[in-house]
């Protein structure tokens, strides 16, 4: 009986997740190109971090690189979301 309840809960969660993603896509459709939006987000993030870390020593300055992926590698962290066509990716930044 517990197994059946657990399976039903997992099935409910699995069905609910794609519905939420489809709802978010419908709400955030603005007509702008998605790749440009991701590039603007990455540029704004890098500019904000550069302003926060105004360091004169070149050895202490970091170069931040961001890319849109389905998952982030070790040493990267999720800094936002990217939208390319109908897919939602993670904005993974290293630096």
Curated annotation (Swiss-Prot):
Its GO CC terms are: extracellular space
In Gene Ontology terms, what is a biological process of this protein? disruption of plasma membrane integrity in another organism
Pro-sequence positions in this chain? 20-61
UniProt keyword annotations, A-Z: Antibiotic, Antimicrobial, Defensin, Disulfide bond, Secreted, Signal
Q: Give the range the annotation lists for the signal sequence.
A: 1-19
Question: What compartments host this protein?
Answer: Secreted
Q: Which tissues does the record link to its expression? A: Highly expressed in spleen, and expressed at lower levels in intestin and lung.
Q: Which domain of life is it from?
A: Eukaryota
Identify the PANTHER family for this entry.
ALPHA-DEFENSIN 1 (PTHR11876:SF28)
Q: What does this protein do?
A: Has antimicrobial activity.
What protein does this entry describe? Answer: Defensin-A3
Taxonomically, what lineage is the organism?
Answer: Eukaryota, Metazoa, Chordata, Craniata, Vertebrata
